Amino acid sequence: MSVIRLEPDFRKEMQNKMLQPTDKFNYCLSCTTCATSCPFVDAHSNMNPRIFMRKLILGMKEDILKDPFVWNCTNCTRCTMTCPQHIQVGALVRTVRGNFGLTAPGYVQKIVDDHLRTGNQMEVKQEDYLDTLQWVEEELQEEVKDKNAKIPLDKKGAKYLYVLNPREVKYYTQDILIAAKIFWAAGEDWTMSSKNWDGTNWALFNGRDNEAREIAKRMAEETKRLGIKTVVMSECGHAYLSNYWGSPLWLGEKPYEVKSILHLIEQYLEEGRIKVDPSKNNQPVTLHDPCNLIRKSKCPGIAEVPRHILKQVVTDFREMWPNRENNYCCGGGGGAVMMGSEYKKEVRMKKGKLKADQIRETGAKIVVTPCHNCLDQLNDINKEYQLGVKITQHIHLVDNALVLS
């Protein structure tokens, strides 16, 4: 018979290492509500939050540090919504990931290291970034037929600093063009940075708060350099969460206000600053709510923002069920999409079956999601389950419906 080593002090150690220290997890009732709320508990093995919690409460430190659940959990926090004690299982998982000598599987740690070393997670050189903005600006001028249309750079005192997911520089430059076109149409006072323009922070996923703090500090310093009070995120769920929720905790102060580009688009539509023709988007559209943006950020009213936009730019919007804060995780969260061979695509696709069923039941032809990680996972799900849908983001539908005067 094997002997299991119990370390009662492990609970206190966990509490002290948490980003937001709490002893609430000591009051776990072992009621299994977390497991019944987890959409993936039966998707594959080592996916039960209740078992993880029991190991933690019993002080099974050695076992927990080897538990695949630590990396299998997508940190969607759906379990916390129904927990009678409101225990933050996701926060506990993140604490284990980053504070006990573990290294994130696949490319997750490399992404963080690259960000710390080069200033952005995809190692884009400054000259390449600036060249990209220059030719995107030329494309903008051609599209809007205005030689004075600009992508402002390092404009001090601008109302908004627009930051990106580096994928938009490397692979999705059209997204930068569309955002600039929307800002031009709305007559917005905005700028981009020549130095710190990456709004992402993958240390949210590896759990290492010292690394997250350094990345957050750089963005805070950039807003001070430019004299800007509000940072606007492109459609990236974890970038929004890491800035809106994470930065005040990592830095000990709220360094700047945070908005999603969706907030601005909603405002422009309400104020009549941009005009759209929804008949340009006449196929049925459904929305996947990203966990980081909709459930975890707890930003008041955030779940309604993408819906307000879609109902004005498409003719046939169909809800998934469940939706908003109760929506199912796509299965690619918590860094899973970049965990490589150590977190096999097969596992992500087992999780993705639930999302595939949700999409299929809507009968939609287009799936919209304001998150790059979700975008990747949904594209894989689309192929795996032969859904035959188009996966896109809000700005593309807004752009398609945009009426330029």
Where are these regions (language model features)?
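A short, charged/proline- and glycine-enriched loop
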Residues: K155-Y160, S279-V285
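Short, structured patches in soluble enzyme cores that scaffold and shape functional sites
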Residues: L164, S260-L262, D289-C291
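Short cysteine clusters
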Residues: C28-C34, C38, C73-C79, C83, ...
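Ferredoxin-type iron-sulfur electron-transfer modules in oxidoreductases and energy-metabolism complexes
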Residues: V3-P21, A43-N72, C76, H86-Q121, ...
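Cofactor-cradling patches in redox/metallo enzymes
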Residues: R167-Y256, I294-I309, R318-S405
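A broadly conserved sequence feature marking short terminus-proximal activation segments
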Residues: M1-L6, C28-F52, K296-P300
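Iron-sulfur-cluster electron-transfer modules
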Residues: F25, K55-A239, G246-W250
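An alpha-beta-alpha
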Residues: K280-N292, K298
